[in-house]
Amino acid sequence: MGIVFEGVADGGSPVAVKVVTTELSQDEVFVRRFQREVAAAQKIQHPHVVPVLDAGESGGLPYLVQELIPGGSLHERIESAGQLDLATTVRLLAGPAEGIDALHGSGLVHRDIKPANILLDGDRAYVTDFGLAKDSQASNLTRPGQALGSLDYMAPEQIRGEDVSAATDIYALGCVIHECLTGTPPFGGRPSMRVLFAHLQEAPPDISEARPDVNAATAKAINRALEKEPEDRPASAAAYVKSVLKAATA
């Protein structure tokens, strides 16, 4: 949300500067979401969440400054590799899963967990981009029935515009694991309306069919996050990733 520039802080360290464009700065709802992103990110102090270093307004344009993570995104890693092995997937996502749980512990739901919002520095990974984050204690900036998020990673309740919860982010994390292992989200490669319908109605694909090196127990553990009902998904993101690792090493 906005344009991101690379900059240099007063002390000489590289930073990422996210600026709302002139056009979007006239959109009151967008600006309020941007301000909410700042407030949400500033609430979280976690080693796997990209911190906000500064925020303000310049020339009428709101901005925020974050630590620059130099290794690109998980999306770029998947695009380059095609697929990741299970060990790499779990290693990369274990930290962000803890960061996601930290968000939830602060009353936040990210609502846009996807590979592009997981940044890498070697094998260390970070959650970023809180532009759609929902504070359970704050007023809602969306209309009833309005869905916000990225289509390939949206939980059924999110598509329906219903209340979101920690389980919504866990669903998205399950979609991310699918993409890491197969190169595509579970219902990817279809027209938009078919993707929506699949999230709402279809059982997720069995990863072991596309990846014979992933055993049936692990495939089942991965798909627990993609249950249609939020209460049927794992209780936390970190516990979910650990359950996948446990199934793989049993």
Q: Where on the chain are the PLM-derived regions?
A:
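Structural helix C-cap motif within protein kinase domains
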Residues: 182-186
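Activation segment signature within eukaryotic-like protein kinase domains
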Residues: 92-93
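Activation-segment/catalytic-loop signature of the eukaryotic protein kinase fold
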Residues: 55
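AlphaC helix of the eukaryotic protein kinase fold
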Residues: 21-43
